[in-house]
Amino acid sequence: MKKALIAIGLILGTITVAIIGYGIYLYSSIQNTAGEMHEPLDRGDKSDKRDVAFDISAQDPFSILIAGVDSREDTHAGRSDTLIVLTVNPKEESIKMLSIPRDTRTEIVGRGTDDKINHAYAFGGAQMTIDTVENFLDIPIDHYVSINMDGFTQLVDALGGVSVENSFAFSQNGYQFEEGEIFLETGDEALAYARMRKQDSRGDFGRNDRQRQIVEAVIKQSAQFSSITKAGAILDAVGESVRTDLQLDGMWELQSNYRGAAKNIEQLEITGEGTRINNIYYLIIPQEEIARVQGELKSHLELS
């Protein structure tokens, strides 16, 4: 995963928590951070798959794409090693979380060729990635958040660590991860946990599970009262590492209107078969599997 995870709760929750905890003193800093993070899409506010733009104040279901970008420091160019789609339904107070395997072969919208889905970010940034994911899943992507490689460890460090449920014991990068509930104290430890693939019989699918676990853990951890005292460090990490089309007022409203959905997070999986085409490895997702996942996400978004 290469230091490339961010949760909607961190973006939509931590800034609000910081305002509550630090008051007006930090407000200008928060505004500056939100401004640094803001990177609008070429398409504007409306997905091509919606008749009208998503209205935050209407409290309707919406979707957000989390892209972990294979880049360092303050750059946001590179391939997306992690693609996670969240659909959020405030009426059901639930979130569905889908990891799209990075080797998934699909059409890269805007290039007219089939390739690995994680190449879309390198070819055309957030906009091409969103267009490609929308075409693949046949749902609107209303907002996006991207984080570069160096951001992940900073965010976990700022939160003071996260708890996850480990399905089997393994070691990675000098860390030993026991079976059962474990606490990942540092960003480096969380990174090692999330990146492990070769010791897992499920390969990338197992790694995707661990990525989703950490996203869920960050959502829950960022909502805790203890995060208030860490707001400054979190904001520093966010400002340097994250890009999003959301502005500060949108983050505030989403946090206010949708935070109840974090109580119920369901992890989804899409599966396929690996193959080699021209000696390049791809994951081929059967059409019936794509249709199954599309139907579940559309239902959660109340589109069908």
Curated annotation (Swiss-Prot):
Gene Ontology CC annotations of this record: plasma membrane
Q: Where in the cell is it found?
A: Cell membrane
Its pathway is:
Cell wall biogenesis
Q: Which residues lie on this side of the membrane: Extracellular?
A: 25-304
Q: What is the membrane topology here?
A: Single-pass type II membrane protein
Tell me the InterPro entries matching this sequence: LytR/CpsA/Psr_CW_biosynth, LytR_CpsA_psr, TagU
Q: Which residue ranges traverse the bilayer? A: 4-24
Has UniProt tagged this entry with the keyword Coiled coil? no
Q: Which residues lie on this side of the membrane: Cytoplasmic?
A: 1-3
Q: What is its EC number?
A: 2.7.8.-
Q: Which GO BP annotation is one of this protein's?
A: cell wall assembly
Annotated family: Belongs to the LytR/CpsA/Psr (LCP) family.
- Please give the function described in this protein's UniProt entry: May catalyze the final step in cell wall teichoic acid biosynthesis, the transfer of the anionic cell wall polymers (APs) from their lipid-linked precursor to the cell wall peptidoglycan (PG).
According to UniProt, the name of this protein is Polyisoprenyl-teichoic acid--peptidoglycan teichoic acid transferase TagU
Source organism of the structure: Halalkalibacterium halodurans (strain ATCC BAA-125 / DSM 18197 / FERM 7344 / JCM 9153 / C-125) (Bacillus halodurans)
By which gene is this protein encoded?
tagU
